[in-house]
Amino acid sequence: MKIAVIGQSLFGQEVYCHLRKEGHEVVGVFTVPDKDGKADPLGLEAEKDGVPVFKYSRWRAKGQALPDVVAKYQALGAELNVLPFCSQFIPMEIISAPRHGSIIYHPSLLPRHRGASAINWTLIHGDKKGGFSIFWADDGLDTGDLLLQKECEVLPDDTVSTLYNRFLFPEGIKGMVQAVRLIAEGKAPRLPQPEEGATYEGIQKKETAKINWDQPAEAIHNWIRGNDKVPGAWTEACEQKLTFFNSTLNTSGLVPEGDALPIPGAHRPGVVTKAGLILFGNDDKMLLVKNIQLEDGKMILASNFFKGAASSVLELTEAELVTAEAVRSVWQRILPKVLEVEDSTDFFKSGAASVDVVRLVEEVKELCDGLELENEDVYMASTFGDFIQLLVRKLRGDDEEGECSIDYVEMAVNKRTVRMPHQLFIGGEFVDAEGAKTSETINPTDGSVICQVSLAQVTDVDKAVAAAKDAFENGRWGKISARDRGRLMYRLADLMEQHQEELATIEALDAGAVYTLALKTHVGMSIQTFRYFAGWCDKIQGSTIPINQARPNRNLTLTRKEPVGVCGIIIPWNYPLMMLSWKTAACLAAGNTVVIKPAQVTPLTALKFAELTLKAGIPKGVVNVLPGSGSLVGQRLSDHPDVRKIGFTGSTEVGKHIMKSCAISNVKKVSLELGGKSPLIIFADCDLNKAVQMGMSSVFFNKGENCIAAGRLFVEDSIHDEFVRRVVEEVRKMKVGNPLDRDTDHGPQNHHAHLVKLMEYCQHGVKEGATLVCGGNQVPRPGFFFEPTVFTDVEDHMFIAKEESFGPVMIISRFADGDLDAVLSRANATEFGLASGVFTRDINKALYVSDKLQAGTVFVNTYNKTDVAAPFGGFKQSGFGKDLGEAALNEYLRVKTVTFEY
């Protein structure tokens, strides 16, 4: 058909393009005149195609159609007029001229909401159903016969923009094309509009959009969302006109803490909170507004209403200045009437419209590859200077999400100044615990107090879980792409690397870790872990599955891997940062949010990590850190109904209790890495030098505070005495001392209670008849130092043969030469199964032993060789679930099956 398109906007442009793709001939386009030198998108598109474009400011004069306009229209020979979006009054001489007449798109379910602000009134009235109508134009106001209608559900927090973008725009384009197709096929109906239910409302303007506070909260919410963006619902407060945007109903019934905002005429003062502005209806129910436009036109976060201009002005680098000038050129192209774009140039006051916002965002994103920029950012920073500041903060990963006031504890140590946060980290802020509760964290090197650390209470856990839940369900974390999530994790790993000396120093101070080992392992492997899982973010995928078809129809079945939600991670004290990283990296890569409970005795690197997440741009609430006791914080996380997964590393006894709590509370998913008594079998045909070296490492690595430490060494009889002699010789060479000294081999045990348990453990071994070859006592110096210890003649029934020391205690037992199956039986005669090892030159023996050992990891001619890509986790009462490797992702994902029939 020959079609004349009459209208404007991106919607009109899309309808025009789709009609041409359908094979229709668009003989002419009638649109609005250029505004401030900018042509409407519909006209621009048609001009590119060589289609005649007419830009009339009016079609009539004194109630009569302009003859020249009518003549030019009639010369086109159109068979149908299509009006996808038209703000002008078109004379009936034009409307009725074509053979098929004219069809009009209207964004409501006619006869309801006739008039120019139909979408606004759909929301203002709280309609549960919305949609659009395509009708045959007549001489009435939206009263013509219906050709086609489509409806959708109106969501409780829909705004004009969300409803338009989700349904009215994409489905409306399809609807217009379908309507034209029906006309071309001679199948288009003409259904008279019913009079029942017909309404007409006037156009919404700024002067009519003032909020009436004497109505329920839901009605106020509907008024605000119905006027969202244009014209904007407003009120007077603080001696200025405030316009509210982005409203949601608050159904929790709890009024958050905040600052009162008196509003004349309101039932109660508003409350400015961290989440936004709480408003009240006359029914005492609440709604939350997230954005406020001030009288000068500046848009701010409602939560910042009383903060003023809180952000300092950034000094731009040379590269950033180049980017700023490139962005200035983009502004100049969009704002041709502005002679020179200056820092004070306001995008909207210079004539920009909403379509220009889209163009600006897309051009800047193309200019700055990987940038996360949304339309809302332009409204929040409408002057060029503010926009550049916002842009640079985002590019640095130091935007608003990263701004936080931190009360540091500073110490001059290890030839540097370390700065350590010491408060709880909840919702992106460092805060005191409920009741200002604190506990001391102790330096195990000398027993001195490092600082007071906030001690989380049950109410703090609830706040942290609520922050994590909100970040997961409503925050930016769940909206960004998986690739962008990976980019943030890479940035976090880079920051950890930049701060690795500081992190390693804190590990030495707080946990007694030998500094050189902390650099390589505690911190180094943590960095590797985040980089490894950052790479997995955009590779988490489901599969398609062939199933039996429901003949004569067909089926398609697919699976999706989804994050589980809020996760609680409870970490031990032996590797404070590394254990955090092993679990948290996989958890975040899967798209979850997290509440981390570090061990009460070693909280400081976890809190430093929290600070780095802010600097990396991880959105607020995604990561929360709660130092505190296991009986309070760990228990509440296990019991909390909004926590969907617990990852725990610690003792078997506590792991059993956590598993029970997870089952009783809400059957939450759980993974447990628990105790161990890992056997290491050393055969006579081994490389003895290597066996001694690795045997030492298997026990004394990280002062023996190592979950996979070899809890018992089985040495073949013919090399037993020589092995023991060499081990004792090496032990006597070990330097026990300050973990910050570069030549120290062996630092202090983690805390005093653990030191006491080690002494009791050794006393137990001596009482039962084991031979104490060396060590077994506290080192006579300040701090929690324990001598590297070696026991021999350990029999299977003894306490030290069965129980884990979790310290620098080597337990050696003999086995008869060639008695392979007997030693395997003894090695497996434990309820633990975390790790194991074997030293032999015989590959057949190595393979046989690795098959038979009942442990999650078997080391052959090595020990402690973990890697971020290799799954880690135990069997039996050493727990279940995996850290590291691809397998770890499954601990933090759920699989959904979706089946289609067609």
Swiss-Prot record:
Annotated site (Essential for catalytic activity): 142
Post-translational modification: Phosphopantetheinylation at Ser-354 by AASDHPPT is required for the formyltetrahydrofolate dehydrogenase activity.
Entry GO CC: cytosol; extracellular exosome; mitochondrion
The reaction(s) this protein catalyses: (6R)-10-formyltetrahydrofolate + NADP(+) + H2O = (6S)-5,6,7,8-tetrahydrofolate + CO2 + NADPH + H(+)
Predominant cellular place of this UniProt entry's protein: cytoplasm
Domain notes: The N-terminal hydrolase domain has an NADP-independent formyltetrahydrofolate hydrolase activity, releasing formate and tetrahydrofolate.
Keywords linked to the UniProt accession: Acetylation, Cytoplasm, NADP, One-carbon metabolism, Oxidoreductase, Phosphopantetheine, Phosphoprotein
N6-acetyllysine: residues carrying this PTM: 882
Name of this chain's protein: Cytosolic 10-formyltetrahydrofolate dehydrogenase
EC number: 1.5.1.6
CDD domains per the UniProt record, alphabetical: ALDH_F1L_FTFDH, FDH_Hydrolase_C, FMT_core_FDH_N
InterPro entries referenced in this protein's UniProt entry, alphabetically: 10_FTHF_DH, ACP-like_sf, Ald_DH/histidinol_DH, Ald_DH_C, Ald_DH_CS_CYS, Ald_DH_CS_GLU, Ald_DH_N, Aldehyde_DH_dom
Protein's UniProt keywords contain Thylakoid: no
Binding site for (6R)-10-formyltetrahydrofolate: 88-90, 142
Top-rank taxon, per record: Eukaryota
